[in-house]
Amino acid sequence: MIDFTTWWQHLPSQMNPVIFSIDGIAIRWYGTMYIVAFAIVYLLSKYRISNEKLPFDKTFPGDALTWAMGGVLIGGRIGYILFYGFDWFLQDPVGTLIPIKFGNGSCAFSGINGMSFHGGLIGVAIALWLFTRTHKVDFLKTVDLFIPALPLGYTFGRLGNFINGELYGRVTTSAIGMYFPAAPTVALRHPSQLYEAFFEGIVLFIILWTIRKKAPWPGYLSGLYLIGYGTVRFFIEFFREPDAQLGFVFLNFSMGQVLCFLMIAAGIGILVWSKQRAENADVMMGGKR
């Protein structure tokens, strides 16, 4: 009988990234987790509209998230190319952007390898900004509608990374370590995907969901999320293996940590700017009275 420690340490090698295949088309856990993530954000946002008397109709989350889905896919891919795979892009610009291989008079889907969270976040922000401009609704109020639910959806994205056996951690002697088949060496490594799923996902969700009704002004939750996620991810990066093609990009910091530092700075900037914006709006409303 296998003891728990042995089972735990070899768990990654027992998981299959493919759920099932239909006519040669593989349905993967990673893509499914993206769908689950969007479904969670959609359902929790609809719950908020129905129970918290927010100024949105019931069709609003679906419309906005349709734009956001395009933003996360495009932004996540472009972000990965710019932040982590620019040399690859220079060698094969078309192949990095279009997941189709051509040859011998035929073409085949080669898959999309590499998505950046930070790029996806920027893509979502741009998509929602365009959406709010088109529908003439407040951008910060729109983002704050989705922010409390976002970390819980993100949790499933990191679980998808874990099932894929990617984004594993650094070598460790701790019993919590695991053997990842895709790692360059046979050694126990931190399951950093699970650390991220728990702290950046579940813990941050509990915090934001608890305080969502107490947000003092539009943009508060958005700024707090950027600071919270950036801070937690920055420290978890010390347990995560740096990307092989980059290593450490500044001193002993990884690209993820550099981006998280910028994310924290952006969060602070949004808090300051949105508070000033709200105060100015209050002054204008007072003058109209």
Swiss-Prot record:
GO process terms (BP): lipoprotein biosynthetic process
Descriptive protein name: Phosphatidylglycerol--prolipoprotein diacylglyceryl transferase
Biological or metabolic pathway of the protein: Protein modification; lipoprotein biosynthesis (diacylglyceryl transfer)
Transmembrane segments: 24-44, 70-90, 111-131, 219-239, 253-273
Enzyme class: transferase
Keyword terms, alphabetized: Cell inner membrane, Cell membrane, Membrane, Transferase, Transmembrane, Transmembrane helix
Keyword DNA repair tagged: no
Family per record: Belongs to the Lgt family.
Described purpose of this protein according to its UniProt entry: Catalyzes the transfer of the diacylglyceryl group from phosphatidylglycerol to the sulfhydryl group of the N-terminal cysteine of a prolipoprotein, the first step in the formation of mature lipoproteins.
EC number annotated for this UniProt entry: 2.5.1.145
HAMAP family in the cross-refs: Lgt
One Pfam family matching this protein: LGT
InterPro entries, per the entry: Lgt
GO cellular component, one term: plasma membrane
Binding site for a 1,2-diacyl-sn-glycero-3-phospho-(1'-sn-glycerol): 158
Membrane topology: Multi-pass membrane protein
Keyword Cell inner membrane: yes
Subcellular compartments: Cell inner membrane
Leader peptide range in chain numbering: none
NCBIfam families documented for this protein: lgt
PROSITE patterns hit by this protein: LGT
Superkingdom classification of source: Bacteria
Gene Ontology MF: a single term: phosphatidylglycerol-prolipoprotein diacylglyceryl transferase activity
